[in-house]
């Protein structure tokens, strides 16, 4: 079975996010009043596995070993079986 995987990675609350701060300042200079700006990285890929459970295990391992730094990042995973 083929699965579409989406991993959304963001800094944990309280972590300094210079990219978001820069965006917020730039928007203010353009006249837009925004607050609580945050940024999120999204990684998408497909996997061919026998079961949803196998994909979940592998993606969790990927996140812990490479995609995320669990000390500073929170992440959400979305997995959908592809038709066909």
UniProtKB/Swiss-Prot annotation:
Keyword terms: ATP-binding, Cytoplasm, Ligase, Nucleotide-binding, Purine biosynthesis
Any one Pfam family match given in the protein's UniProt record, by short name: PurS
SUPFAM superfamilies in the cross-refs: PurS-like
Nucleotidyltransferase is among the record's keywords: no
EC number(s) given by UniProt: 6.3.5.3
Compartments where found: Cytoplasm
Recorded GO CC terms: cytoplasm
Pathway: Purine metabolism; IMP biosynthesis via de novo pathway; 5-amino-1-(5-phospho-D-ribosyl)imidazole from N(2)-formyl-N(1)-(5-phospho-D-ribosyl)glycinamide: step 1/2
Transmembrane spans: none
A GO term, aspect molecular function: ATP binding
UniProt keyword Transcription present: no
Catalytic activity field: N(2)-formyl-N(1)-(5-phospho-beta-D-ribosyl)glycinamide + L-glutamine + ATP + H2O = 2-formamido-N(1)-(5-O-phospho-beta-D-ribosyl)acetamidine + L-glutamate + ADP + phosphate + H(+)
Xref: InterPro entries: PurS (IPR003850), PurS-like_sf (IPR036604)
GO BP terms, alphabetized: 'de novo' IMP biosynthetic process
Protein's job: Part of the phosphoribosylformylglycinamidine synthase complex involved in the purines biosynthetic pathway. Catalyzes the ATP-dependent conversion of formylglycinamide ribonucleotide (FGAR) and glutamine to yield formylglycinamidine ribonucleotide (FGAM) and glutamate. The FGAM synthase complex is composed of three subunits. PurQ produces an ammonia molecule by converting glutamine to glutamate. PurL transfers the ammonia molecule to FGAR to form FGAM in an ATP-dependent manner.
Subunit annotation: Homodimer. Part of the FGAM synthase complex composed of 1 PurL, 1 PurQ and 2 PurS subunits.
Sequence similarity: Belongs to the PurS family.
Protein name listed in UniProt: Phosphoribosylformylglycinamidine synthase subunit PurS
Organism: Methanothermobacter thermautotrophicus (strain ATCC 29096 / DSM 1053 / JCM 10044 / NBRC 100330 / Delta H) (Methanobacterium thermoautotrophicum)
């Amino acid at each position: 079975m083929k699965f579409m995987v989406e991993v959304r990675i963001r800094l944990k609350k309280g972590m300094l996010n210079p990219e978001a701060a820069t965006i917020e300042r730039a928007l203010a200079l353009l006249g837009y009043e925004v607050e609580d700006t945050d940024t999120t990285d999204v990684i998408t890929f497909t996997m061919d596995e026998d079961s949803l459970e196998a994909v979940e295990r592998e993606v969790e391992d990927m996140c812990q070993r490479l995609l995320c730094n669990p000390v500073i990042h929170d992440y959400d995973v979305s997995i959908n079986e592809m038709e066909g």
